[in-house]
Swiss-Prot record:
Top class in the EC scheme: lyase
Coiled coil: none
Principal place of residence: cytoplasm
This protein's UniProt keywords: Amino-acid biosynthesis, Cytoplasm, Histidine biosynthesis, Lyase
Family, as annotated: Belongs to the imidazoleglycerol-phosphate dehydratase family.
SUPFAM superfamilies, sorted: Ribosomal protein S5 domain 2-like
Protein name: Imidazoleglycerol-phosphate dehydratase
UniProt GO cellular component terms: cytoplasm
Localization terms from the record: Cytoplasm
Domain of life, source organism: Archaea
Enzyme Commission (EC) number: 4.2.1.19
Source organism of this protein record: Methanocella arvoryzae (strain DSM 22066 / NBRC 105507 / MRE50)
Length: 192
């Protein structure tokens, strides 16, 4: 079973992540940031991963450290759950609409953490979540997981835009991590 647990504790945050890549989309998320809980629940549901996240951060300052460290911890857990990456598809993509918004996410489980993020949000916050942290979450997750992630979001409602992106990320990662019995290591180099 492809699963992992990561615990990260700093002076700013205390985070535990448990993930099973071959799950059913069940989740228990408690980050202290209501909108982020909703997004990570959508990510798990559409990515068919079982996910538990318990996070405490210095939210009295702002949401930066908490969102960043959740991205780092989730990325580490995802990387650990994949293990040596033998027999995975490697590439995945998804186009997800949500009313007027459209999110396009493409991923490569390459071992090279990198992100490209294109979106223009209209509001600085959605509830208690800073929209600018969406880009930072993707970058932190990508670098920590060793996954290249390209994101492009269009739309008018920031909530719809961010939610479509989290759903698309879940779908794209599910596709890329899918097992393919015909594959060994999906690289001409022989390593990822």
């Amino acid at each position: 079973m492809r699963s992992a647990t990561v615990h990260r504790q700093t002076r700013e945050t205390d985070i535990t992540v448990e993930i099973s890549l071959d799950g059913k989309g069940n989740s228990t998320i408690d980050t202290g940031i209501g909108f982020l809980d909703h997004m990570l629940t959508s990510f798990a549901k559409h990515g068919l991963v079982d996910l538990m996240i318990k996070a405490r951060g210095d939210l009295q300052v702002d949401d930066h450290h908490t969102v960043e460290d959740i991205g780092i911890s989730l990325g580490e857990a995802y990387r650990d759950a994949l293990k040596e990456k033998t027999g995975i598809e490697r590439f995945g993509h998804a186009l997800v609409p949500m009313d007027e918004a459209l999110a396009v996410v493409a991923v490569d489980i390459s071992g090279r953490g990198y992100s490209v993020f294109k979106a223009d949000f209209r509001q600085p916050k959605i509830g208690d979540y800073s929209t600018a942290m969406t880009r930072h979450f993707i970058d932190s997750f990508a670098r920590s997981a060793g996954i290249t992630i390209n994101v492009k979001i269009e739309g008018e409602d920031d909530h719809h835009m961010v939610e479509a992106m989290f759903k698309a990320l879940g779908l794209a990662l599910s596709m890329a991590a899918a097992k393919n019995e015909r594959r060994g290591i999906p690289s001409t180099k022989g390593v990822l």
